[in-house]
């Protein structure tokens, strides 16, 4: 298969259909712009399965996603889109960079969900962008904000039912050949912070990032909690 993009933890191939791609999830985890690397067995299939369930749930809420279906344990067929070079972060609690860069303590509930933009460029260390800078890049930030908040509303309720607090998450978007906007990339514990309600237990990549434990059992726990919801 023709490789379109070789990412840190995923490879994107051209599909048989010119308007489709195949995304392969690898048993690999990175942090610190690739400075930390590990290869946890089974991690790729877990992220692929979790993403597929979440994409399907969001599609039922009329949120357009690039996802079509899974093929095998760690691959999915997706609609081909041109990825926007932005990482869009939605925050419900203070964690990560917002703690490092403000006076907020980790875990502080935010008065309302905050949507932030970061340039998708490792060489520049993914700098924070203002909405005006997003506009200067040629993109209207409002559709990204609106869709991200819709995603947050749904996922926050879904994870609450699972006993999980959705602290924050990252999404990426792309435009198809007709100029329509789609949620793309993935939504998995690699791109979310998930804390067990009422405890300090975590189910996300911070376990690896902060050397606090094995991510595979944590990701498997998220998949186990998601699967009963997948059939609803």
Mark where each language-model region is.
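C-terminal helix-cap and adjacent tail motif
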Residues: 108, 187-232
